[in-house]
Amino acid sequence: GEQKLFQGVTLGDDKSIGKTFNFMLANPPFGVDWGKDERTKKRVQDDNCPGGRFEAGLPSTNDGSLLFLQHMISKMDKVNGSRIGIVLNGSPLFNGDAGSGWSNIRKMLLDRNLLDTIVALPKNLFYGTDITTYLWILENKRPAERRDKVLFIDAAHAEYTRLLQKNLGKKRFEVSEEGAEDILNIYREFKNCTRDIRYEKTGEVEHIEVAKLLDYEDFLYTTVAVRRPLRLWYENIKDKYV
């Protein structure tokens, strides 16, 4: 099919107005300040209206991650369906209390039944940062058995990685073929599951939960954290997503 590349500032200059796409992948810059450039800031604020790209709300100016996500959502094909994969830092999951722009955007994802899966990725996957990152998967034509639910996958373990022979900046690992295959299988099964995980510091192997399926209703009252030792757990903080 036709292939086109557009050079420009995504948030401030939409090069694909009126177009929709069936598959979209993105790794937007982490923590980009969308308020520095006045032209971009004005365009973003202008699109924060009913029917605009950013109608759900605006995050704080020091992190535009959820603006990039909303931009992609605005390009979803409502007839034939679309799937989005986007790598984000932890801010979109944890920042903002109830009523904030962050919270309103997250609420939109649930109200429209778009959020399908969030994968916590291992650290040291990127050249310029060693932070924990998350792969979000969204769909607008989800099958009945996946609707109103979100799957959290904890892939932030050495079992999912391959050590590089030479570091590339802060990038020390990449997701291994076996790790990617297991993540894909867990995503397809869309249910709770456990794996044997070895912890680096102790060398001990534990059989732990690496995937947790939540109803949207439960997710409204739940946040997810991944820390050392890397495991997934849930804390009840009702002021985050309501």
What does each model-found stretch correspond to?
Residues 2-8:
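Conserved SAM-binding strand-loop segment of SAM-dependent methyltransferases
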